[in-house]
């Protein structure tokens, strides 16, 4: 009875739109991570692209997914979140279907004679445009549908549901891929998004913000981009931090290829990645946060960076399902140590009065990592496979991780020196 009462209190403490938006986010992430985990294998084994070509296409798609929300948020604010959700889920539902249709025999006659590469490129860019409205609309709803008292808890619920989707989506993808084929994973993602379109139309009600003020124009957003780019210390930090995400996304680039080619074609790489990664975060995020909360922000980021970088040694020594799973769990521990502190550090580094502006570019390192890292991952694997030495990919990732860790340590050292000098001058 006490548990039921507590759950009811939590439910009633938020506006109904909060739960609708987060429920839609769960299914959107389910759709995204479900298709992302099979993306590289689908492009190579079904559509006939090389690993290098697949990496390039993945980089464009993933890069746009994380870059466009910077501008998509402006349109979402202007249109209202309900309308933005309608547009987003309509485009995502159609986009995922089109991507999957390229591998379906039923559509072979329609696409015959067309350049598969450029056709897929068009479908990916179209789908990424739809995805650009999701995060701003969900995070915007969380912000306006919660109070100052429960807002922190509201974002914790959002983060937990994102990881739940990241675990459930690839799990479903495995069973669909095993029974029907990779192309039908995109059909599941499409159905999931169209279902959320229906949910949005029926259940989502716009929440009016208590804060009043003019919505930033698209021109103002672009001008703000140059303000952020002009902050040298912030940009150096973001560029170094992007090295972390380059390594992370190899779980979706290199790991599926390696398991498929060298461990077993039917091996459940989807479950290995999702349960070891997102599953670990769901279970251990809160206790790890409590254990590391007193570590200085930059130190916590460095520790998380180092842990996530060096774990590839576990895989490199003896690549197998158990060691890959163990490596991904260890990587997730590193992520849990540093990820929450990353946003905290952005608030610290931002000039007074510009914290919100700088937080708006928090996803920029992921966009950089996808644009750069996905093609690198595809090329690395392709080259190692041709050379008959697939294990070199793990040592290459270790090299990137060590380099990134050293860069972050150097950054921390010089920032500490700079801050000490500033303190002396101000004394």
Cite the ranges covered by each PLM segment.
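Glycine-rich segments within core transmembrane alpha-helices of 12-TM secondary carriers
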Residues: 65, 152-177, 192-193, 362-374
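Juxtamembrane intracellular "pre-TM" segments in multi-pass secondary transporters
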Residues: 2-15, 210-239
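A membrane-interface helix-boundary motif in multi-pass transporters
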Residues: 114-117, 175-192, 379-402
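Intracellular juxtamembrane helix-capping segments at the cytosolic ends
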Residues: 133-147, 336-351
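Short amphipathic helix-loop junctions that connect adjacent transmembrane helices
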Residues: 37-53, 253-271
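C-terminal ends and interior cores of transmembrane alpha-helices
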Residues: 90-115, 306-319
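Helix-to-loop junctions at the C-terminal end of transmembrane segments
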Residues: 68-81, 177, 283-297, 381
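Multi-pass alpha-helical transporter architecture, strongest
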Residues: 194-207, 395-427
């Amino acid at each position: 009875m006490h548990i039921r009462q507590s759950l009811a209190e939590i439910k009633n403490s938020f506006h109904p739109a909060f739960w609708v938006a987060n429920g839609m986010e769960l299914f959107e992430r389910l759709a995204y991570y479900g298709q992302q985990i099979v993306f590289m294998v689908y492009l190579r084994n079904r559509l006939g692209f090389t690993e290098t070509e697949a990496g390039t296409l993945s980089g464009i798609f993933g890069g746009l997914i994380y870059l466009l929300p910077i501008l998509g948020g402006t349109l979402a604010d202007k249109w209202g979140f309900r309308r933005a959700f309608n547009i987003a889920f309509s485009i995502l539902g159609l986009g995922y279907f089109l991507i999957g249709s390229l591998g379906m025999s039923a559509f072979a006659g329609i696409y015959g004679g067309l350049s598969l590469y450029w056709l897929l490129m068009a479908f990916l860019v179209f789908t990424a445009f739809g995805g650009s409205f999701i995060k701003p609309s969900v995070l915007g709803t969380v912000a306006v549908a919660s109070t100052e008292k429960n807002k922190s808890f509201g974002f914790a619920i959002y983060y937990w549901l994102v990881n739940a989707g990241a675990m459930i989506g690839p799990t479903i993808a495995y069973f669909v891929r095993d029974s029907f084929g990779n192309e039908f994973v995109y059909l599941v993602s499409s159905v999931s998004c169209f279902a959320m379109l229906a949910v949005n139309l029926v259940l989502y009600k716009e929440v009016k913000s208590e804060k009043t003020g003019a919505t930033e124009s698209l021109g103002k957003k672009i001008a703000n981009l140059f303000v952020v780019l002009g902050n040298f210390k912030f940009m150096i930090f973001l560029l170094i931090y992007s090295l972390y995400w380059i390594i992370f996304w190899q779980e979706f680039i290199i790991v599926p290829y390696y398991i498929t080619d060298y461990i077993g074609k039917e091996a459940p790489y989807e479950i290995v990645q999702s349960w070891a990664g997102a599953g670990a975060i769901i279970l251990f995020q809160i206790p790890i946060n409590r254990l590391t909360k007193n570590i200085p922000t930059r130190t916590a980021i460095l520790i998380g960076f180092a842990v996530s970088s060096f774990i590839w040694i576990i895989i490199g020594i003896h690549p197998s399902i158990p060691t890959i799973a163990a490596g991904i769990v260890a990587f997730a521990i590193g992520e849990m140590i540093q990820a929450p502190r990353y946003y905290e550090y952005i608030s610290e580094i931002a000039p007074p009065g510009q914290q919100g502006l700088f937080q708006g570019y928090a996803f920029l390192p992921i966009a950089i990592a996808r644009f750069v890292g996905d093609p690198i991952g595809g090329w690395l694997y392709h080259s190692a496979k041709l050379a008959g030495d697939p294990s070199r990919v793990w040592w290459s990732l270790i090299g990137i991780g060590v380099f990134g860790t050293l860069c972050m340590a150097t950054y921390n050292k010089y920032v500490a020196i700079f801050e000490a000098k500033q303190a002396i001058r101000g004394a």
